[in-house]
């Protein structure tokens, strides 16, 4: 019940998964991942294909979950990183090429997208 409330699925709980929007399907995935109270939550492209409202809701939900758990987020949507993450690790060809707090990027005024392309090209 707590997970249903946390993921805002209460009104959708009686629907079949195929009846849900992409955003609610993402929420169901998060709820399923949270059932066994993992210490670490691994999310692969959790904001892909969401409409603007769903995007904000899922971002906020991930940030809220991140207050109590380690959340590893895999994404190719560079603009999402500073909106969700407090640390960035860039992996290129199986090797870590960057491992830094987002605060450092912000203080130094680094353009994350350009930095990513420089490290991975």
List the model feature ranges, each with a label.
Residues 1-73, 78-92, 97-98:
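ABC transporter nucleotide-binding domains
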Residues 25, 117-118:
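Compositionally biased, intrinsically disordered low-complexity regions enriched in proline and serine
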Residues 95-117:
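Conserved beta-strand-loop-alpha-helix hinge in the C-terminal portion
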